[in-house]
UniProtKB/Swiss-Prot annotation:
Keywords: Cytoplasm, Methyltransferase, RNA-binding, rRNA processing, S-adenosyl-L-methionine, Transferase
Compartments, record wording: Cytoplasm
A Gene Ontology biological process term: methylation
Gene3D superfamilies: PUA domain, RNA methyltransferase domain (HRMD) like, Vaccinia Virus protein VP39
Protein's UniProt name: Putative ribosomal RNA large subunit methyltransferase YwbD
Family stated for the protein in its record: Belongs to the methyltransferase superfamily. RlmI family.
GO MF annotations, alphabetized: methyltransferase activity; RNA binding
Keyword Magnesium: no
Its EC number(s): 2.1.1.-
Domain PUA: from-to ranges: 1-79
This protein's record includes keyword Cell membrane: no
GO CC terms, sorted: cytoplasm
Organism from which the protein derives: Bacillus subtilis (strain 168)
Native organism taxonomy: Bacteria, Bacillati, Bacillota, Bacilli, Bacillales
InterPro entries per the UniProt record, alphabetical: PUA (IPR002478), PUA-like_sf (IPR015947), PUA_sf (IPR036974), RlmI-like_PUA (IPR041532), SAM-dep_methyl-trfase (IPR019614), SAM-dependent_MTases_sf (IPR029063)
């Protein structure tokens, strides 16, 4: 077994359950390592055994711990144990009649960092986040085959190109190829999903509870603006909740046809709603000039985005984006402020919110908060894994 030696301070983090092996934690070079190598992680002070894991480059990490038992083998039985435990924890979701898509295995939260598995009405989607974890593909899929999942097919997304980008490929792995789009249900809402059309599927499963809240408690009789709307999933939830009108804005050309599709599978008249393909920042300027006001605004930008004209980073730019949102929010209107950035926590996010309102001389109250749903399992030792922060604010 190859050894990976960590600096003393970082060894203490691993001892407390931190699962990511950070680049800066290494005491010396990892030049002798190759992606997928199983490693024993030891402290530079006396060579104390800390954990067993694998080497795989991912963002700021060089791998993940898998067990703190030096006698445990990392084999098919290991993966089967982790997968079985994860499936058992989601038994209620498997049985649910009105929800047929959810996260089956959530990386380090379920014991194996660098890989996630989503369940889409009988289809499995595996996402690999490093070449290292990808070397365990056959072992992991064989473990899945030992389970009583009765899946229709397995698809995959390889997200380990330069800077963690998606590797364009035919994503079919095994089983019966799906005829896409398939229609999944989420709390009774129908969404069209394609597992073999690029990096994304058409729905972000981690926002399930937020869409339900919008439909059930916030949309009725309201004018709704959905920014960075992607396929319009929030807009559909609002329309089904009785919104007077929704406006969906996204810069991607594909968003128009995809949003029409999501309205149509729910038997909603998409022509009664506005779907705009344009830069959200330009739309804010347009709305301010036209003196438009919305009762409910959904603000869920990507953590990082680059267009021809600008670069957006949630960590740097969310406050200013929120200031523009506040300007077109009606009195007593609600803003769904959301971010999936793992670069900062809820406390800092609330700091952005507070600063935005102070700088616009407006007041607000927090009426509801969300983090990841229960199927996106996290561990307290790795707060970065609980990346989703959603705060519902009412403008006073």
């Amino acid at each position: 077994m190859k050894l990976l030696t960590l600096k003393k301070a970082h060894a203490a983090k691993i001892k407390k359950g931190y699962p990511l092996i950070e680049k800066e934690a290494l005491a010396g070079s990892a030049g002798h390592m190759k992606e997928g190598d199983l490693v024993d992680i030891v402290s530079e002070s006396g060579g104390e055994f800390l954990a067993r894991g694998y080497y795989g480059l991912q963002n700021k990490g060089v791998g993940w711990t898998l067990t703190r038992n030096k006698h445990e083998q990392i084999d098919q039985a290991f993966f089967l144990s982790k997968l079985t435990k994860a499936a058992q924890a989601r038994a209620k979701l498997f049985e649910a009649q009105d929800t047929t898509a959810f996260r089956l295995f959530n990386g380090e939260g379920d014991g194996v960092g660098g890989v996630t598995i989503d369940y889409y009405d009988g289809y499995l989607l595996i996402q690999w986040y490093s070449k290292g974890i990808y070397t365990f593909k056959d072992m992991l899929i064989s473990a899945l085959d030992e389970m009583d999942l009765d899946y229709k097919a397995i698809y995959e997304k390889k997200r380990f190109d330069t800077a963690g980008q998606y590797v364009e490929d035919d994503d079919f792995v095994k089983g019966r190829r799906g005829e896409f789009p398939i229609i999944i249900q989420e709390n009774g809402i129908q969404y069209a999903v394609d597992l073999n059309e690029g990096a994304m599927t058409g729905i972000f499963l981690d926002q399930r509870h937020v869409r339900k809240a919008i439909r059930d408690r916030y949309a009725k009789g309201k004018t709704v603006l959905n920014t960075f709307s992607y396929t319009g999933a929030f807009s559909v939830a609002a329309a089904l909740g009785g919104a007077e009108k929704t406006t969906s804005v996204d810069v991607a050309n594909r968003s128009l046809a995809k949003t029409i599709e999501q309205f149509s599978v729910n038997k909603l008249d998409y022509e009664a709603h506005d779907i705009k393909v344009m830069d959200v920042f330009n739309y804010f300027s347009y709305a301010a000039k036209k003196d438009l006001r919305f009762d409910l605004i959904i603000l869920d930008p990507p953590s990082f985005a680059r267009t021809k004209k600008r670069t957006f980073s949630a960590a740097k730019d969310y406050k200013n984006l929120l200031k523009e949102t506040i300007a077109i929010t009606a009195d007593k209107g609600v803003i769904v402020a959301s971010t999936n950035s793992s670069a900062f926590g809820m406390k800092k996010f609330k700091g952005f919110i507070d600063a935005a309102f102070k700088e616009t001389n407006e007041r607000y109250t927090i009426i509801e908060e969300f983090t990841l749903p229960e199927d996106f399992k996290t561990i307290s030792a790795f707060p970065e894994g609980n990346y989703l922060k959603v705060v519902l604010l009412q403008k006073k």
